[in-house]
Swiss-Prot record:
Domain of life of the source: Eukaryota
Subunit structure: Interacts with CADM1. Interacts with RAC1.
Entry protein name: FERM, ARHGEF and pleckstrin domain-containing protein 1
Record InterPro entries: Band_41_domain, DBL_dom_sf, DH_dom, Ez/rad/moesin-like, FA, FARP1/FARP2/FRMD7_FERM_C, FERM/acyl-CoA-bd_prot_sf, FERM_2
UniProt gene name: FARP1
Primary subcellular site in the record, as a coarse category: membrane
Lineage: Eukaryota, Metazoa, Chordata, Craniata, Vertebrata
Organism: Pongo abelii
Length: 1045
């Protein structure tokens, strides 16, 4: 081992000039005096598996050793890294930067300390230095080899292909296979060799810096990126793993994330002996504080994990290093541990303010790479592009969610892999660039509360592109953690897995990861946008016709979910009977073919309408003739439309009778392309005709009777009105049928929810008064029964039915004065009474109105009540047992809050989960209104604290905005549920100074959207108001006033 000390430094190996390192101290600070005394030699294993020896005073604090390593590497952003070493009980711990080394490393001659990445930021563009990104890439390579970073074969092959590109340069099949034979990057590498070589061929011309960037771009989307698992058990003794990340504390079962606790929701972390305790902040409408308890192997394991959590919280959430507390005079209680070092905010500010000189370095991965042309290419151009990208990018702490979509992380045991031979990839030593090359202002900003909102992630992984200049980002909310990877029980799967389908053939812009929507695609300046808007025709009819085009694009994509994606999946899996196939697909394919041609005709007419050379030809400036021709054609397709309700019923019956078909459909719903429940797509053709009717009504209202297009528009309106009237009854019946089946998937504890005659009325969140105080429950109102449920801490993310109240004979009254609880109601049934409280007066009034209506219906149809109750969960308790039974259900809830039993994956982006987290409700009437208010088109988006506008393709449906980079994308990149949001017009003080801008805000989360014309602005306001007012029921007539809608 003594030979290690005689090795040349990385700088001398790479031919870099000697330097004295870069100080990481803040301005005005002085380095602590280095303790004098005996020097001790400590061996450090670098990320490339080489070892270096450092002599430091044995009584020096750990920070001295870490600074020595960072100075040796000339590493500016050393705060992301740490030193791992075994303690006296052989437990691997992080070196405490404040404690003397002699107390932490007892036998330094026999200990090898590892220099590794400690803090993984949510976005690798926050790493300012190319050297830092290179070290992160080495960490990813190491995690792959050691089985920590689990992913599917495609992801693994793509990751390795970027590593190979970085190490040996451009594709050469013989050299590739020789290199792969000598270097094992992953245990199952032999099976992936052909795929790795195929992917590597696509990286020709990519520099090592670009390869590192793309490697991190892919890796950061994997669920296990930067995750270190710590074994534990929950209260019930279920074996789980705990981990900590930039977003908060995560819970895993195997390699599958089943829950997460966002930092914003955590009030206190503590440990008592072997018990690790998480105290959550109370809900806004409840004073009850939930404390979760996990049992670890020993006190030392527990304390070690607690320290890691404290450090992650401080590094990612605090603005500056916490000040030490004064030591007690007589007695001390608890651990004195505290975070030491700069926070991420301080690191980003230090780089942004030009606190260092730009560092460049030359890498020489191997002898092969040193003789290839790629190794000699400068990386300054790429660094400049990245720097531009970082100048205006909003930095956010990604929640992950994020969201349903195919899982990329495979389950299984963690394989043990020996590290590569030392010396194969020497540690990098950077060389300095000329003075004055400073980082541009605005390279980074601290995360704001607004930027932490989580939207459901549906990441699309394609071949990543080099970063482009950007102007902002799109995020969503920890308040919506139900839709993220940080959801309790769940934004991913419900747990939203950030598992991209890594297809290198799809060349699209770098996609977003929930909640970060990169602005690297479609950057536009305000001047460019103004120029584009001025070239549009000014006639309102043009924008009405354009709405037909944009919504038709979305409709075709929805049809393709059935005709292309679902049919392709069915053909690969023999899970569907032939009779069901022949009922579904032959009745959708003619519609897809017809509407494909319809869209072409509309777009051709719009192109002529917009063309400068044809601007004066009035015959092109109409759409009524195209609509009339195609609506007449739609009448011949009515036979297929009538079959859709039959297909929906047959599919649900098939799912009920076949477990295999049920699992197949559930797995398909978890794919990113299926962004809504599967049965919703089966009803899309029935809904589409209503939109044609609305468009033609607007055209007829706009055109005077003398207009050339008026007669065609009126004839087309008459035709589509007739079709809508014929299909209306079927549509109402099928919407209720579809909603019952959708709710059935969200509930456990009731198997016979869908019975003839049952109608859904309202669902939403209410607080139920019990012996433990007010506790949040999810209520489901039907025309015969009221169910109340709780959401447990489970992987399935479903709601457990805890009780039912038959409506027949029920009474309802307000009881605020009786119980002293605002917005309180007493529901008194024949067998049981409960007290509930709504979140607001308006919510209470909506529940009272709908419950009373349902009670009246139950009274009128009393002869049906026994049949309905027989189909509900059995409830044979006597009135005397009601109180005890209710108490038992509370105990069940307590157990479910900590039960981490692995169940089948489940969508976590349904309206039930949105209402749970937004503490609101929706009715069947609201769902029917939502069907009539669907819209698609381009919008410009900006944040409250960002400067530029980003162009996005936006689809509004099901109370939710879905965001795409362009209309050609097959699935959304992110989504933002709008229940609970307020819709307003920006005030003068907000300094927007643009036309056609509207604002969406929920608590501290603010988004600005900008339309291209007055008509599209009014349409977006109209449809979004339908979602926001379903929660608030506040209407304002003029959109020019800055008022809540």
């Amino acid at each position: 081992m003594g030979e290690i000390e005689q090795r040349p430094t990385p700088g001398s190996r790479l031919g870099a000039p000697e330097n004295s390192g870069i100080s990481t101290l803040e301005r005005g600070q002085k380095p602590p005096p280095t303790p004098s005394g005996k020097l001790v030699s400590i061996k450090i294993q670098m990320l490339d598996d080489t070892q270096e020896a450092f002599e430091v005073p044995q009584r020096a604090p750990g920070k001295v050793l870490l600074d020595a390593v960072c100075n040796h590497l000339n590493l500016v952003e050393g705060d992301y890294f740490g030193l791992e070493c075994p303690d006296h009980k052989k437990i691997t711990v992080w070196l405490d930067l404040l404690k003397p080394l002699v107390k932490q490393i007892r036998r330094p001659k026999h200990v090898v300390v590892k220099f590794v990445v400690k803090f993984f930021p949510p976005d690798h563009t926050q790493l300012q230095e190319e050297l830092t990104r290179y070290l992160f890439a080495l960490q990813v390579k190491q995690d792959l080899a050691q089985g920590r970073l689990t992913c599917n074969d495609t992801s693994a092959a793509l990751l390795i292909s970027h590593i190979v590109q970085s190490e040996i340069g451009d594709f050469d099949e013989a050299l590739d296979r020789e290199h792969l034979a000598k270097n094992k990057y992953i245990p199952q590498q032999d099976a992936l060799e052909d795929k790795i070589v195929e992917f590597h061929h696509n990286h020709i011309g990519q520099t090592p810096a670009e390869s590192d960037f793309q490697l991190l771009e892919i890796a950061r989307r994997l669920e296990m990126y930067g995750i270190r698992l710590h074994p534990a058990k929950d209260r019930e003794g279920t074996k789980i793993n705990l981990a900590v990340a930039n977003t908060g504390i995560l819970v895993f079962q195997g390699f599958t994330k089943i829950n997460a606790f966002n930092w914003a929701k955590v009030r206190k972390l503590s440990f008592k002996r072997k018990r690790f305790l998480i105290k959550l902040r109370p809900d806004a409408n409840s004073a009850y504080q939930d404390t979760l308890e996990f049992l670890m192997a020993s006190r030392d394991f527990c304390k070690s994990f607690w320290k890691i959590c404290v450090e992650h919280h401080a590094f990612f959430r605090l603005f500056e290093e916490p000040k030490p507390k004064p030591k007690p005079v007589l007695f001390s209680r608890g651990s004195s541990f505290r975070f030491s070092g700069r926070t991420q905010k301080q690191v980003l500010d230090y780089v942004k303010e030009g606190g260092h000189k730009k560092v460049q370095f030359e890498r020489k991965h191997s002898k092969i790479h040193s003789i290839r042309s790629l190794a000699s290419q400068p990386t300054e151009l790429y660094s400049e592009v990245l720097e531009q990208s970082q100048q205006s990018a909003s930095l956010t702490f990604g929640e992950g969610a994020e969201s349903p979509g195919g899982q990329s992380c495979q389950q299984g045991k963690e394989p043990k892999v020996s590290p590569g031979e030392p010396g194969s990839h020497p540690s990098p030593v950077p060389r300095r660039s000329p003075a004055g090359n400073k980082q541009a202002d605005g390279a980074a900003s601290a995360p704001t509360e607004e930027e932490e909102e989580v939207v459901k992630d549906r990441t699309q992984q394609s071949k990543p592109q080099p970063p482009q200049p950007s102007t902002g980002s799109l995020t969503g909310s920890p308040h919506l953690s139900e839709l993220s990877v940080n959801s309790q029980g769940g934004v991913a799967p419900a747990n939203v897995t950030l598992s991209p389908n890594l297809s290198p053939d799809t060349k699209q812009a770098s996609p977003l990861i929930s909640p970060l929507l990169n602005d690297q695609a479609c950057p536009r300046t305000d001047d460019e946008d103004e120029g584009r808007r001025k070239r549009f025709p000014t006639d309102k009819a043009y924008f009405i016709a354009k709405e037909v085009s944009t919504t038709e694009r979305t409709y075709l994509k929805d049809l393709e979910v059935i005709t292309s994606w679902f049919q392709s999946a069915v053909s690969k899996e023999d899970a569907m009977p032939e009779a069901l196939k022949s009922l579904i697909f032959p009745n959708f394919e003619p519609l897809h073919k017809f509407h494909t041609n319809f869209l072409k005709e509309i777009e051709q007419r719009l192109a002529l309408w917009e063309g400068r050379s044809n601007a004066q030809i009035r015959d092109y400036q109409r759409i009524g003739d195209v609509m009339l021709k195609n609506i007449q054609g739609m009448k011949h397709l009515a036979v297929h439309l009538w079959k859709h309700s039959e297909a929906l019923e047959a599919l649900e019956n098939g799912i009920k009778s076949s477990r295999r078909l049920e699992n197949f459909c559930r797995d398909f719903e978890l794919q990113k392309v299926c962004y809504l429940p599967l049965n919703t797509f089966l009803l899309r053709p029935l809904h589409r005709h209503m939109h044609y009717k609305q468009v033609l009504e607007r055209l007829c209202k706009h055109h005077p009777p003398s207009h050339a297009d008026f007669r065609d528009c009126r004839a087309a309106l008459a035709g589509i009105t007739e079709m809508v009237a014929q299909l209306h009854g079927t549509m109402i019946k099928m919407e209720n049928f579809q909603k019952l089946h959708e709710l059935k998937k969200d509930l456990i504890g009731i198997d016979n929810l869908v019975v003839p005659g049952r109608e859904f009325i309202r669902l939403g969140s209410l607080s139920k008064l019990s012996g433990k105080g007010l506790q949040q429950r999810m209520f489901f109102l039907f025309n015969d029964v009221l169910l109340y449920t709780s959401r447990g801490l489970t992987a399935s993310n479903q709601f457990k039915v805890h009780g039912q109240l038959p409506l027949y004979g029920m009474t309802i009254k307000e009881s605020e004065d009786e119980w002293g609880v605002p917005h309180c109601l007493t529901l008194r049934g024949q067998r049981q009474s409960i007290i509930v409280a709504a979140s607001s007066r308006s919510e209470m009034e909506k529940w009272v109105e709908d419950i009373q209506m349902a009670i009246d219906l139950a009274e009128k149809n009393s002869s049906l009540a026994p049949e309905f109750l027989a189909s509900s969960p059995p409830d044979n308790k006597s009135p005397d047992e009601a109180t005890a039974a209710d108490q038992e259900s509370e105990d069940d809830l307590s157990a479910s809050r900590t039960s981490l039993e692995r169940q089948a994956p489940h969508r976590g982006n349904t309206m039930v989960h949105v209402c749970w987290h937004r503490n609101t409700s929706v009715s069947m009437v609201d769902f029917s209104v939502a069907v009539e208010n669907q819209l698609s088109g381009n919008l410009l988006r900006k944040f409250k604290n960002s400067n530029g506008w980003q162009k996005l393709w936006v689809v509004f449906t099901n109370f939710c905005l879905f965001f795409y980079k362009s209309h050609q994308d097959n699935h959304p990149l992110a989504s933002l549920p709008l229940l609970g949001y307020s819709l307003t017009i920006p005030t003068e003080s907000e300094n927007i100074h643009k036309d056609y801008v509207f604002k969406l805000h929920f608590k501290s989360h603010v988004y600005y959207f900008r339309a291209e014309s007055e008509y599209t602005f009014e349409r977006w306001m109209e449809v979004i108001r339908s979602a926001t007012s379903s929660a608030s029921r506040v209407h304002v007539s003029s959109h020019k006033e800055s008022l809540v809608y």
